[in-house]
Amino acid sequence: MDASPRSRLSRMVKWFWQRPQTGRSFALKSRDAASSSTKIDFAELAPGIDTFLGQAAYLQLGYFETLSQLITSTPELAQKESLSRAAGAAYIKHRDLVALIRERGDEPTALMLPFREQLDAFRTATHGRRTEETMLTVHITAGMLDDFYLALAHSYGDTGRRVARILQADDDRDAIVTILTAKIEADQEWRSLLGLWGRRLVGDTLLVARAALRSGH
């Protein structure tokens, strides 16, 4: 019987933290020097509701945009179809968060705009040179930040509960795990490359979470 998406993801995470093998390797994008902080105290992060909603909505829009770009750059039809499902899921989450913001009497663009520059810079910095790197970027950053905002949602009463339901909807990213797992299992060089890239993404995602949430103070 095939491994579940969760077990495949666990294997990928394990690979990320194994020491890369020596030998020929691909070059990675350089990391901005501003990403050098090492530890984050999540207990200190408590943004206002407008900050929380604006960031959550804009993040989903960013996932949708990146996945849409991946559809264009991916040659295989089956992979395009899988990516289109993931893009559609991100769009639905964005749409539902925007609807919630409007129900509260606020203008979605006004809440999202303060975080556009910062979050766009994060997306640019974590956009890989290769399609597979960017697939991994979406899978790791979206997964971590969705979980992070889901945990924060419990601080915002009924509005937070509604946000939690939106974020808990199916993200349709299982196919990305399948694609990347096949690539890693078939090629030692890709295993090393994506392992390094994955570790970098974890650190950068924690940094953007801290910076974005503290901007609400």
Each model region followed by its residue ranges:
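An amphipathic alpha-helical core segment
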Residues: 165-217
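Active-site-proximal alpha-helical scaffolds that flank and shape metal-associated catalytic sites
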Residues: 109-178
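Acidic/His metal-coordination segments adjacent to aromatic residues that form catalytic metal sites
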Residues: 17, 34-54, 114-138
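Alpha-helical scaffold segments that form or flank carboxylate-/histidine-based iron centers
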Residues: 48-53, 77-92, 134, 158-175, ...
